[in-house]
Curated annotation (Swiss-Prot):
<feature type="transmembrane region" description="Helical; Name=10">
    <location>
        <begin position="904"/>
        <end position="924"/>
    </location>
</feature>
<dbReference type="GO" id="GO:0032588">
    <property type="term" value="C:trans-Golgi network membrane"/>
</dbReference>
<dbReference type="GO" id="GO:0005783">
    <property type="term" value="C:endoplasmic reticulum"/>
</dbReference>
<feature type="binding site">
    <location>
        <position position="766"/>
    </location>
    <ligand>
        <name>Ca(2+)</name>
    </ligand>
</feature>
<feature type="binding site">
    <location>
        <position position="770"/>
    </location>
    <ligand>
        <name>Ca(2+)</name>
    </ligand>
</feature>
<feature type="transmembrane region" description="Helical; Name=4">
    <location>
        <begin position="292"/>
        <end position="312"/>
    </location>
</feature>
<feature type="transmembrane region" description="Helical; Name=7">
    <location>
        <begin position="803"/>
        <end position="823"/>
    </location>
</feature>
<dbReference type="GO" id="GO:0072659">
    <property type="term" value="P:protein localization to plasma membrane"/>
</dbReference>
<feature type="active site" description="4-aspartylphosphate intermediate">
    <location>
        <position position="377"/>
    </location>
</feature>
<keyword id="KW-0479">Metal-binding</keyword>
<feature type="modified residue" description="Phosphoserine">
    <location>
        <position position="266"/>
    </location>
</feature>
<keyword id="KW-0812">Transmembrane</keyword>
<feature type="region of interest" description="Interaction with ORAI1">
    <location>
        <begin position="69"/>
        <end position="93"/>
    </location>
</feature>
<keyword id="KW-0109">Calcium transport</keyword>
<dbReference type="GO" id="GO:0006874">
    <property type="term" value="P:intracellular calcium ion homeostasis"/>
</dbReference>
<feature type="topological domain" description="Cytoplasmic">
    <location>
        <begin position="1"/>
        <end position="104"/>
    </location>
</feature>
<feature type="modified residue" description="Phosphothreonine">
    <location>
        <position position="262"/>
    </location>
</feature>
């Protein structure tokens, strides 16, 4: 109190012209507190994220000083609030932060949309308000449908995946709190336990038998042992044993550490930067639509120029001819094209969603239709990522096979070749081998999931299949010598419960290390001396199992290290996912090549490749080292012949994809790890796993397989091919109708004849009539034979030569038939009458409906695809027919459309004539089938 009183006195001093009053004690307290708070705020805001390579060198005390944190009590809420102002939330800022209005406006960047808007403006200027309103409405429908679908797709993705783990255990204000991981800031003290997903980059300060699965980050299958000791130098990220990274998983043990990086300041953030640096290529559909838009633009303006020139030569007013030219240009543009394309893509996405596949961008579905190479990661994609014991060899020569995959415990162990099922110790040698694997084990299997190392989980499940799953409880563990990459084995010293026997060691590990500690081998429960011949036999068995791609573990037991009894070998593998083999076969039959790109060894990769039918006797494999050493051009020349790439890194994967793309391939890449994300972004189609996939891989991908089912890709390819054919069907129908209408009006203008169709009739044909039938073609069910067709070339456009010929043929038939009726009905004085236009108008509409019927398939007859298969098409045709009859016979509509009643004979005549376009199209399909069959029969003897 005395010191504070003297301080107050010093504040009362004389200035030159003023006397300052002494402050009260509470005012001084407030002043001091404010100064202290300002300094505290500055100190907290100055705290920065620490790179892992620097953090790994710090001692615990240096780490605490750097982050201004008490390791025993954690940060205060005040410190957290200040640091969050600088570092933000522990999450990634994704592309989905783009404003909604901007996403909506982006839909207008399509060239067809811009052309339609231009036509609408010109229609307003020329007072063609009906056309302007119709076109504007069509544009709004297009952009709204596209916006809603992409918006819903993004929302579905947000629901499926979170960019950071949702919860964690954090020490704050001296209390351990269970909180959202997004709340973490640099300097937070986080507690980790078995099964936790690491919520941020963390420098460990305490560990107890901590093993972390970093396979999603580094590609290494085996969990990494962690320490809390400072390291001498910061090497590769995978060697930083005292740092754990966001998104990796605690397999066993527990630990505590300080957060050194959050959100985009974590190592995930570095991968995100690489991912965003990769430019996403345009899809083939986007390229085709762009080209079609340009072609239609050139065609439309050419017609305008031609008609204005003809009209000027004939002495007609230029403004009148310009109005006609613009109207014809609008008619020539298939205004339903963007709508049907969008609806077709949306329906494809919805069908795929039912098959548990989320598509982030609509055109990606179609891109799969021309995909001819699928590069797939092995672990977790082609395989189940569930290590499973499949073979046993005992030291005395018994062989057994194990059925059942995964961690459910379902399956049996059978002796070979007798197929005798073994339970417990019905075969002593097998029983002792399985017992050792279960006791020298730290994994726990619950509810079909493993807590701990997957390899150890496989041994526990093996014991469960022999009813020995609880045998570990019969022992009291007294000591453990943990596994290390240097010694390549682990051992436990145990004693039987309630029995006064000497302790026994159980050991498992690499064969060459375990056999080194053995002096005897087990022979039906009796230890015999381990002779060189016996060692050689066991070594041969180990090599034989290894050549099959199995991970081989040797097991032994005995009273002390160095005097152990060798028990035998267990072969473990990550088995293929259900349905993968069938999917690979179906894709291969449709000329889609599946390539495995993995970080595993050659033997393991080949074993899985053979199991799923990926490769044949002419298999070619290439290592990541070879990929790195080759020039890009040389790699592009060889990469198509290689089926398996092994020992690859993320950098190698990107190089492989780019080489495939340079060779002309459309590449789909599947993956689930952080190490796959850059490759997913580089590929034409990136496909991530929904369950085992990391958040970064999902963000990088274009599609997500919700159930991690590789066979769903087969359905996606089928959808992609079917969607493109549906779009071609619609384009054929729409353009043949538009060209026929355009030619009809152009010919009548050039020949100085009266117009066969008036303005309202043209509007009916182009906007109303072409809408429902055309859109129903877009929802035609996917052709069942679509998957069998080879992938479409990326150079192919929607309007290829064959389709153009069919369009021109249909347009010529429609034009010829309508002109025949018009010429038949026109009076001698060549003046237009209501009957003349009604007959020509109805004839054109009937042609339109029959043309739609023939356009349901480019190759199959109507009887093959099924008349009633597409109900929406039938409803649209029926609705259009009823609408046309209403226009002809309803008095109010007769006045609007300037029509008159037609007799039944007139309708029969028009129906018979209009059906010619359908009959001719079906005959053409028959001819094509006959020619294709004859060509195939001719090639068969040559092939033989």
């Amino acid at each position: 109190m005395g010191r504070r009183f003297k301080f107050l006195q010093k504040l009362a001093f004389l200035g030159q012209n003023h006397r300052y009053k002494a402050l009260e004690r509470d005012e001084v307290d407030t002043l001091i507190d404010e100064q202290y708070e300002l300094k505290a705020i500055e100190r907290e805001k100055a705290v920065a994220a620490l790179p892992p390579r620097e953090a790994c060198k710090c001692s615990k005390e240096e780490l605490a000083r750097t982050f201004h944190v008490d390791l025993d009590s954690g940060l205060s809420e005040f410190a957290v609030a200040q640091r969050r102002l600088v570092h933000g939330w522990n999450e990634f800022v994704t592309d989905n932060t783009e404003p909604v209005w901007k996403k909506y406006l982006d839909q207008f960047r399509n060239p067809l949309i811009l052309l339609l808007l231009g036509s609408s403006v010109v229609s307003v200027l020329t007072k063609e308000y009906e056309d302007a309103i119709s076109i504007a409405l069509a544009v709004l429908i297009v952009v709204t449908v596209g916006f809603i679908q992409e918006y819903r797709s993004e929302k579905s993705l947000e629901e499926l995946t979170k960019l950071v783990p949702p919860e964690c255990n954090c020490l704050r204000d001296g209390k351990l709190r269970h909180m959202l991981a997004r709340d973490l800031v640099p300097g937070d003290v986080v507690s980790l336990s078995m099964g936790d997903r690491i919520p941020a980059d963390i420098r460990l300060t305490e560990v107890t038998d901590l093993l972390v699965d970093e396979s999603s980050f580094t590609g290494e299958v085996e969990p990494c042992s962690k320490t809390d000791s400072p390291l001498a130098g910061g090497g590769d990220l995978s060697t930083l044993s005292n740092v754990v990274f966001m998104g990796t998983l605690v397999q066993c043990g527990k630990g505590q550490g300080v957060v050194i990086g959050t959100g985009e300041q974590s190592q995930f953030g570095e991968v995100f930067k690489m991912m965003r640096a990769e430019e996403t290529p345009k899809t083939p559909l986007q390229k085709s639509m762009d080209k079609l838009g340009k072609q239609l633009t050139v065609f439309s303006f050419g017609i305008i120029g031609l008609l204005m020139l003809v009209g000027w030569v004939q002495g007609k007013p230029l403004l009148s001819m310009f109005t006609i030219g613009v109207s014809l240009a609008v008619a020539a543009i298939p205004e339903g094209l963007p709508i049907v394309v969008m609806v077709t893509l949306v329906l494809g996405v919805l069908r795929m969603a039912k098959k548990r596949v989320i598509v982030k961008k609509l055109p990606i579905v179609e891109t799969l239709g021309c995909c001819n190479v699928i590069c797939s990661d092995k672990t977790g994609t082609l395989t189940a990522n569930e290590m499973t014991a499949t073979q046993l060899v005992t030291s005395d020569g018994f062989h057994a096979e194990v059925s059942g995959i995964g961690y459910s415990g379902e399956g049996t162990v059978c002796l070979l070749p007798s197929k005798e099922v073994i339970k417990e110790f019905s075969n002593v040698s097998v029983g002792k081998l399985v017992e050792a694997g279960c006791v020298a084990n730290n994994a726990v299997v619950r509810k079909n999931a493993v807590m701990g190392q997957p390899t150890e989980g496989a041994l526990v499940v093996l014991a469960m299949k022999m009813n020995l799953g609880s045998i570990k409880d019969s022992y009291i563990r007294k000591k453990e010598i943990p596994f290390s990459s240097e010694q390549k084995w682990m051992a436990v010293r145990c004693s039987l419960k309630n029995e006064d026997e000497e302790d026994v060691y159980f050991m498992k590990g690499a064969f060459e290390e375990v056999i080194h500690h053995c002096s005897t081998y087990n022979n039906g429960g009796i230890p015999l001396p381990l002779t060189p011949q016996q060692k050689s036999y066991c070594q041969q068995e180990e090599k034989k199992m290894g050549s099959l791609g199995l991970r081989v573990l040797a097991l032994a037991s005995g009273p002390e290290l160095g005097r152990l009894t060798f028990l035998g070998l267990v072969g473990i593998i990550d088995p293929p996912r259900a349905g993968v083999k069938e999917a690979v076969q179906a894709l291969s039959e449709s000329d889609v090549s599946v390539k495995m790109v993995t970080g595993d060894a050659l033997e393991t990769a080949l074993a899985i490749g053979r199991t799923i039918g990926l490769c044949d006797e002419k298999l070619k494999a290439m290592s990541g080292e070879e990929v790195e050493g080759m020039e890009q051009d040389a790699l592009a020349a060889r990469v198509r012949q290689v089926s398996v790439f092994f020992r690859t890194s993320p950098k190698h994967k990107v190089k492989i994809i780019k080489a495939l793309q340079e060779s002309g391939a459309i590449v789909a890449m599947t993956g689930d790890g952080v190490n796959d994300s850059v490759a997913l972004k580089s590929a034409d189609i990136g496909i991530a796993m929904g369950q085992t996939g990391t958040d970064v891989s999902k963000e990088a991908a274009d599609m997500i397989l919700v159930d991690d089912d590789f066979s769903a890709i087969m359905s996606a390819v089928e959808e992609g091919k079917g969607i493109f054919y549906n779009i071609k069907n619609f384009v054929r129908f729409q353009l043949s109708t538009s060209i026929a209408a355009l030619s009809l009006i152009t010919l009548s203008t050039v020949c100085n004849l009266p117009n066969p169709l008036n303005a309202m009739q043209i509007l009916w044909v182009n906007i109303i009539m072409d809408g429902p039938p055309a859109q129903s073609l877009g929802v035609e069910p996917v052709d069942r034979d679509a998957l069998k067709r080879p992938p479409r070339s990326v150079k192919d456009t929607i309007l290829n030569r064959a389709l153009i010929l069919k369009i021109l043929m249909s347009a010529a038939v429609i034009l010829g038939g309508t002109l025949f009726i018009f010429w038949r009905e026109i009076p001698e004085n060549r003046t237009s009458t209501p009957r003349t236009t009604t007959m020509a108008f109805t004839c054109f509409v009937f042609f339109d409906l029959f043309n739609a019927l023939s356009c349901r398939s480019q190759t199959k007859l109507i009887f093959e695809i099924g008349f009633f298969r597409n109900r929406m098409f039938l409803y649209s045709i029926l609705g259009s027919l009823l609408g046309q009859l209403a226009v002809i016979y309803a008095p109010p509509l007769q006045k609007v459309f300037q029509t008159e009643n037609l007799s039944a004979l007139d309708l029969l005549l028009l129906t018979g004539l209009a059906s010619s376009v359908f009959i001719l199209s079906e005959l053409l399909k028959l001819c094509e089938k006959f020619c294709s069959r004859a060509k195939a029969d001719q090639m068969l003897p040559e092939a033989v």
